[in-house]
Structures are given as structure tokens and as C-alpha cells.
Amino acid sequence: MSDVLLVLNAGSSSIKFALYEAHTEPTADHLICEGGIGSLGHRPHFKVVNSDGSTRYDTYLPEGTSHDDAMAVLIGWIETTFPEHRLSAVGHRVVHGGALFDGPVDVTPEVIAQLRAFDRLAPLHQPHNVSAIEALAKLHPSLTQIACFDTAFHHRLPEVATAFALPRELTEQGVRRYGFHGLSYEYIAGRLPDVAGQAVADGRVVVAHLGAGASMCAMLRCRSIATTMGFTALDGLMMGSRCGELDPGVVLYLLEEKSMTAREIEDLLYRESGLLGVSGISDDMRTLLASDDPHACEAIELFVYRIARELGSLAAALGGLDALVFTGGIGEHASEIRRRVCEQAAWLGVTLDPDANARLSGAGRISAPDSKVSAWAIPTDEDLMIARHVWRLADGGR
């Protein structure tokens, strides 16, 4: 019986997973299958695809299926479908680790209690990340569970890059910039030498993780030195339904003049803003790019503008720029967004190769051969990054 590793990413209405062989440190070739249970709270859809993209399982679950029920269904399906494998460990994507966790950690009751303290700092993700850990612990109390943090890659940011200009006692209580999407950035940092060469990897690189959640990270020698997200995953770039950077005075105005509650403001900023709020149409960039509605065009323009603004800021933190990397769902697939960003980055030395950008599939260069600053698109793989952490920390790494 051979060991397998399970990677889980639990959200408000879904549980996504990937299953890997665990006889050696995982690579993309060790993926067995992946999928998830979506639309929880409505009509849950359970779909699994093989590593080659073919459908392995596709069904609907009863309406009213809870997250805990869905977890039981998923684990039961894995055990029934793969009787020749033993589930040796599970890795969870956990968005916020605060200042406590600078790397993956074995989950204990004490760790769970510490993670619960961050629920309010990442309300879209953290409560569901931790609930999945708790549900699995009830199903399999002896199963090794590893928490892998989106904040860990930024744990050694320079102090000046983490500080807010607030009274020192608040800073000492942990009110500071943490940064997120760290699992994605860590994966890209590992891929840079192979895709772009060691000289680029050792240089001044800005990576733009663009998806429903969006952020950017300035890397020097593949280490994070500045990032756009802050105390929470609400800061920085405009996102699918999140506002990004916002004058705190707007929050005070909503509290005092509009008599909104904290929970109403949370819903507004996290779930009703961003591309969705500006366009009034959708939080999906594909829908907006296909639309000729002026509000959709305005949302796209603002999205690109905010990226260009932050790119200049991060280049300043680096003292210059050697390479720009796009990743995430939008960064990997929306050549039009890449084109617009690169055109606005011409002053930094980015010269786009329009043909290379338009035809790119997978990882590759999209800048002209004579571009002073090279530009690249590299697909990310947060699941694989988690699987590697789990393998190193669990049985495979001991």
C-alpha cells in the first residue's frame, strides 16, 4: 500500500482538493487527481478530474449538504476509489498565520485556537480554512494535518515594509503589514530559475498574482521585500469583489454619516466592491473583457491603473526593476490585461512582444528580445507548494 498526500483549500462555498503520490517529494507529475465540491449551500457539485484533465467523477450532492458533510463525502470517496493507497497526511491552505507562524506547522488543538484568533482578519477565508481542519480531525483524529500559510513567505519582510504609521503600542500588538498569496509567490520563486534563468531570479523582480484575489510582491534574490496586501487580504490592488487600497476616512464616513455597522461595511468592502462593484456586472474578468458596457470598461481600466501604480511603488522599493512576472488566473490567461499593464510600464523599460503575449500558453517570455526589463507569465501551483511542504514536514521529510 503506497502513501498519498491530500491538499485542501476550503472556502465559504467550496472545498477544493488535490491528491498526490507521496513516495518522493511531489512534482506536478505526481498529481493523481484534483477537483472539489462547489456551490455548498445551494446544489453542491462534486467533480474530480484526472491529472490529464479527463473527468473521473461528476455528481451532485443533496441540497443542504454542509461543509462537514462534504468533507466526509470527499474523504469517503478517496478511500473507496483508491483502496491501494493510504492517506498519510493532509495539507491545508490557511490564509493568515500572523506573526506566530513563519512556516508550515503540525496542527494541534493549540494551533487551531491560535488560528481562530485570525478569523476577523481574513473573513473570506480563515474561518473556513480552520473549520475544514476541525471537521477532518473529527473524521480521522490520528491523521497528520499540516497548516501552510499564505503569510509565511513574507515573514522576513524588512521592518520598514511592515510598519503602519500608528502608535507603537498597536504595532507591538500585531497591527502591521503581513502580506498574502505567499504560497503562490514561493512557488514562482522556485520556478524563476528554470523559466527565466538564474540571472533574473537573482535580480529585482515584481510578481503580479492576479485573480479573484490580487496582489503584487517585490522580490530580491527570490525573497519578499515588499508586497501590496497588508494587515488583511483586503488591501492593495482592486480585486474581484474586494476594494483594495482605500482611504480609512471612507470607513469613518460610512460609520458616522451612513450609519452602517461594522458587518455591513465588511460585506461592502469584501463582497460588493472591486470589479463587481465598479462594473455592476460581474467579478469575473472574462465577463468584463467580453462586455462593451462602459462600466465594465471602467472597471478594467481601474484594475490596470492600480496595478501600474503599485508596480511603480514596488520598483522603487527594489531600487529598480529587472523583470515583471504575471501569474494567477488573470495573469496567466488574460493576455489583454498583460498587454495593458506592460504598455503602462514602458517608462520602467518594459517593451512587450505582442505576438508572444497573444500566443503564450503555459510559462514563457512575453517581452521583446531587446526589452530592458523582461516580462514573463508563469502559471502558479499553490497545491503543489503545499504538497511539498507536507511531504517535507510529515513522513517523507523525516
UniProtKB/Swiss-Prot annotation:
GO MF annotation terms: acetate kinase activity; ATP binding; magnesium ion binding
Cofactor note: Mg(2+). Can also accept Mn(2+).
Record pathway: Metabolic intermediate biosynthesis; acetyl-CoA biosynthesis; acetyl-CoA from acetate: step 1/2
Cofactor(s) named in the record: Mg(2+); Mn(2+)
Catalytic activity: acetate + ATP = acetyl phosphate + ADP
Binding site for Mg(2+): 9, 382
Biological function: Catalyzes the formation of acetyl phosphate from acetate and ATP. Can also catalyze the reverse reaction.
Family as reported in the entry's similarity comment: Belongs to the acetokinase family.
Protein name: Acetate kinase
Organism of this sequence: Rhodopseudomonas palustris (strain TIE-1)
